[in-house]
Amino acid sequence: MEKNIAVIWGDCSSPEIVKQTLRVLDKVAEKYGHTFHYTAAAMGGEAIDKYGDPLPQHELDKCLAADSVLLGAVGGPKWEGLPGEQRPEKGLLRLRAGMGLYANNRPAKIWPQLAPASPLKPEIVAQGIDFIIVRELIGGVYFGQHQTHTLENGEKQAVDTMPYAEHEIERIGRIGFETARKRRKKLCCVDKANVLDTSRLWRAVMHRLQAEYPDVEYSEMFVDNCAMQIVKNPAQFDVIVTENMFGDILSDEASMITGSIGMIPSSSLGDGTRGLYEPIHGSAPDIAGKDIVNPTACILSAAMMLRYSFGMAAEADAIENAVSRVLDKGLRTADNMSEGCTCLGCTAMGDAILAELS
């Protein structure tokens, strides 16, 4: 099979993890008889430095022409003083909107080998942590109207709106139900329906969808309670579906209970098969150039790309199993190092995963 992949190398330490990920993809292509073509696309700080824009149209066009997009991470201290529209993160928002990616799927799973690294009590971890947060990605408060104005008394007031239309809720809700149907058949819709009209509309739409999925156990939970339950009893969750801002916050919380943010991939999908795949961690500017950043989340993101966009389940399994065997051997990067294990740098971890793939 032949596929075209747009590669956003990213900022700070990001190119280091992307380099190792492409090595893994090349090994998969060699082993399974595929051909992957890579096209570099600039976004974030790199694009700001080159073009004065976090995502110029010609760079977005490269992503739209590809079968899928692999991203490292963008941003860093160098660009923090820029106005909002010129910041690296704005490029990511525009990329998601331009590609029509409305569903972010982020797994929260503890690898058994890394269970001691979880900040949760061992008895909670022992119950199992394996759920997915399906987050609506291009609606809500991040894409609503934003304004700051001056009141009559001279003080400033800022207003951000959280708009959602029924079709936006229905399409993400359907992905939530379909995802649950393929897993343990439990879906929890997280909202703030006791306060927000948008949340009440979410519930109304989800109730209509529920009738189409009688095999899925459906429940609802307020976002504040969900934030507590994720650390108190994470084993109760299978799939969580929620709006943009709630999902942003909850998925970051969920990432921390797994023991290492450097192990968590993510996918962003729309109506077709083309998606955006990226690790959930940032660009780690403090360790850039030191060859110590953990490439595993980016490599696992590539595995998600093979599975969800290219239909290459066996190839994705091969990568994930290779990572598991590396962990079985006690090989770690600095972020998830524990007593009795061997600490590897970024390139060495890439080498170890490649060796397990061979």
Regions found by a protein language model. Give the residues of each.
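N-terminal glycine-rich phosphate/adenylate-binding segment common to multiple enzyme folds
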Residues: 49-159, 245
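Glycine-rich phosphate/pyrophosphate-binding loop and the adjoining helix
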Residues: 138-139, 143-183, 187-188, 193-195, ...
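Extreme N-terminal starter segment of soluble prokaryotic enzymes
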Residues: 1-5
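Buried hydrophobic positions in well-ordered alpha/beta secondary-structure cores of metabolic enzymes
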Residues: 11-14, 67, 134, 176, ...
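Glycine-rich phosphate/diphosphate-binding loop of Rossmann-like nucleotide-binding domains
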Residues: 6-23, 27-29, 153-224, 236
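Generic secondary-structure signature for well-ordered alpha-helical cores
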Residues: 26, 30-34, 65-68, 97-104, ...
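Glycine-rich phosphate/nucleotide-binding loop
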Residues: 45-48, 231-331
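N-terminal beta-loop-helix "entrance" segment that forms/cooperates
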Residues: 33-57, 228-230
